[in-house]
Regions:
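Substrate-recognition element of Asp-dependent hydrolases with the DxDx(T/V) motif
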Residues: 87-117, 171
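Asp-based, Mg2+/Mn2+-dependent phosphohydrolase catalytic module
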Residues: 108-109, 113-209
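Conserved beta-strand elements of the Class I
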Residues: 1-4, 159, 212-214
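Small-residue (G/A/S/T)-rich helix-start motifs and N-terminal tracts that mark the onset
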Residues: 209-242
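N-terminal helical cap/lid subdomain that shapes the substrate entry/recognition surface
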Residues: 1-97
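Conserved SAM-binding loop
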Residues: 10, 83, 101-104, 160-161
Length: 242
């Protein structure tokens, strides 16, 4: 089976999480400090709303700020969030190889469903798993293990596609085969992702250019052995850097 992250992996959407504070302040006629996006990026929405209220001396209540920020994010996924180049071709190839797929995301299910409906890719996934439902973030393997159990696929037989280092490490330690994908928001961590992941690619089109095994597990009964052999083929073909 295959488990996909969403933001930064399938969708080129990480930028909204750095821009949303600026967008909110602009909407109420306030100019944001240049590094606001970086400051808010590591905060929860609740923490960010409190920071903005206090730092910019806003009269709005924190709950109102939080809801306005959530509305901006929701509109972005409903109307704008784009697919990464080559994503549909990859999903189509996996589906044609009879490989079941699920989503494992830190985002809200509502935003994912809206974006997937607009982009017409919901059909590729059997289910969407979220960290909120799993009861833990991606520093713990719960969401991956739940997704694999749903797929009926052991970790060693399952590919996990991720773009951030902490998620790559978590999935790898849990026994999954991890493919790292480049994203601009995580560019400072790319060397670590290359070292930690089983395989790594700059983009999905790079992967699709090579004769690799996206015919992998799920198309037959070879299971983990099939994936292991195919990952070695990918590495040998130079698609990925370890």
């Amino acid at each position: 089976g295959a488990i996909f992250d969403v933001d930064g992996t399938l969708l080129d959407s990480m930028g909204i999480w750095k821009d949303v504070g600026v967008r909110y302040l602009n909407s109420i006629g306030i100019e944001a400090e240049p590094d606001l996006g970086t400051i808010l990026f590591t905060m929860s929405i609740q923490e960010g709303a409190q920071y903005v209220k206090e730092h910019y001396h806003l009269s709005q209540e924190t709950d109102e700020i939080e809801q306005n920020v959530l509305d901006i994010i929701s509109d972005y996924y409903k109307e704008t969030a784009p697919l990464k180049s080559g994503a549909v071709e990859l999903l189509e190839k996996l589906r044609n190889s009879n490989i079941p797929m699920t989503i494992a995301s830190s985002n809200n299910k509502k935003e994912i469903e809206m974006a997937f409906e607009r982009l017409e890719i919901a059909k590729y996934f059997d289910r969407i798993f979220t960290c909120e439902e799993a009861g833990a973030g991606k520093t713990k393997p719960d969401i991956y293990l739940q997704a694999a159990e749903y797929l009926g696929s052991r970790p060693e037989e399952t590919l996990v596609f991720e773009d951030v280092i902490h998620a790559v490490r978590t999935a790898k330690k849990a026994g999954f085969q991890v493919i790292g994908i480049y994203d601009e928001a995580s560019k400072d961590d790319q060397e670590e992702i290359q070292r930690e992941a089983d395989c790594y690619c700059r983009d999905w089109r790079e992967l699709m250019k090579k004769k690799t095994a996206l015919t992998i597990a799920g198309s037959d009964s070879s299971g983990g052995a099939g994936i292991q052999a195919d990952i070695k083929t990918m590495q040998a073909n130079g698609v990925y850097a370890m």
